[in-house]
């Protein structure tokens, strides 16, 4: 395993194994360049599979961004500095494909357009966003609040499907440095009566805790905009007649 900054290998490790195995290793990077909207620095990660007798068998490359999201004294922080969000609620529609972009360039254009309008964050509302969108957010420096489509009627089936799909989404996307917040629930959709029904409130709290257990490297907004029972941030959605 090698971590590269440009053409230079800045960290590496070799792990011996046999047969099918899950490998974990920890690499130390001295004085890392932290990812931020102003400097969305990414490191290349290279994994090479070697056979002691025949040499290289396979190689895969990816990338990683290093950053810290925290809440300090009631203030959302990125890399230890107070963070002021200029965010847009983005439902990810495309004229040709509704929720599906027809090209990778269309996804990149969405990120570039958001940044060009002066925003530094997008809340991907009611959509598990395309991984290529997240790639461009990582690369171009757009922070993301990641959400999922909500259920409508509270039931055992909702609990099972939502929990399974949410876990899959977190495990798929948690390596993206651009994601600074997980939003498992929006405005009590699917849990409309959590203030009166303990089982609904317990479900919200359980999913919030599950999210933190799967990934504690960013904040969790348990129920965005409506009743608060758990999570790192308390958010309000205020609607005014125009």
Predicted segments, located by residue:
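Secreted/periplasmic carbohydrate-active enzymes, especially glycoside hydrolases
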Residues: 1-124, 128-131, 136, 140-144, ...
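Substrate-binding/catalytic cleft of secreted carbohydrate-active enzymes
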Residues: 109-112, 121-242
């Amino acid at each position: 395993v090698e971590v590269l900054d440009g053409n230079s290998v800045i960290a590496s490790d070799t792990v011996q194994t046999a047969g099918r195995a899950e490998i974990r290793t920890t690499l130390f990077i001295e004085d890392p360049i932290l990812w931020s909207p102003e400097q969305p620095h990414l490191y290349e990660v290279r994994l090479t599979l070697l056979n002691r007798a025949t040499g290289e068998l396979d190689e895969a490359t990816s990338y990683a961004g290093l950053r810290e999201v925290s809440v300090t004294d009631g203030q959302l922080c990125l890399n230890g500095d107070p963070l002021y969000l200029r965010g847009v609620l983005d439902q990810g529609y495309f004229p040709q494909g509704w929720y599906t972009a027809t090209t990778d360039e269309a996804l990149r254009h969405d990120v570039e357009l958001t940044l060009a309008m002066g925003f530094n964050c997008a809340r991907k509302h009611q959509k598990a966003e395309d991984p290529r969108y997240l790639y461009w957010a990582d690369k171009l420096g757009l922070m993301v609040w990641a959400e999922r489509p909500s259920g409508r009627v509270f039931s055992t089936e909702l609990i099972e499907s939502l929990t399974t799909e949410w876990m899959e989404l977190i495990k798929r996307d948690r390596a993206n440095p651009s994601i600074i917040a997980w939003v498992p629930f929006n405005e009590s959709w699917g849990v409309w009566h959590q203030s009166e029904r303990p089982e609904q409130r317990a479900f919200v709290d359980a999913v919030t805790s599950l999210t933190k257990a799967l990934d504690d490297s960013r904040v969790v907004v348990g129920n965005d905009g409506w009743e608060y029972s758990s999570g790192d941030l308390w958010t309000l959605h205020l609607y005014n007649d125009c």
